[in-house]
Amino acid sequence: MKRLLLVLCAAVIAVPAFGQSVSVKDGNIQFTDKSGQTTALTSSGRDSGPVLAPDGKWVVFVRKVDGKPIATGSEEVEPTELWQVRVDGKEATLLVKTRDTGKPETGIAAFGSLQFSTSGKLVYFVTPAWAVTGAVYVVDTTNRKVRYLFPGSDVKVVSSGEYKDHLLVLQHRYFIGGGSYDWYWLVRSDGKEIGPVGETTENFEATHSE
């Protein structure tokens, strides 16, 4: 009897535990559920950069498209689109297209540093813009409205704690006496600055995460 119990316990311990995740294979987005089963969500062969929403129900990703390269203050970028799809592969929706307007505050050249708000409703991203920094935008996934927020080369959403849903933004700034520096700053989602964080976000995350 004891031997049987030991065998049963060993069998229970040996059962692998999986978390939901997303990946890319041959240019297609894949979703792996909690049981470890992987399903292809797209079939274009041109998709990359998937990010899973906090509720585990939606995925955003970037799709390559044909078209003229988009000029920015730092480089030329091949056109892409930002899409979302449910984890069951249904309701694939185009959210934002790249656009060349000649102005950093309105032009969108790429979709980097994709970050969901904790509600999963908003998606923040960074696009190349000026010579020394990018531009941070946000799109509402429920109505596809997109707007420019502020300059920045990286953006992170604070997922918990006192500053939940605030943003950590890497910005290029200048010293009064000359020279420049790149620091992360804590800002509200409406753009109001809270204060400096530093060259990295490690200390902030260690102090202000639940």
Placement of each model-derived feature along the sequence:
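Sec-dependent N-terminal signal peptides
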Residues: L4-I13
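Sequence signature of WD/YWTD-type beta-propeller architectures
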Residues: A17-E210
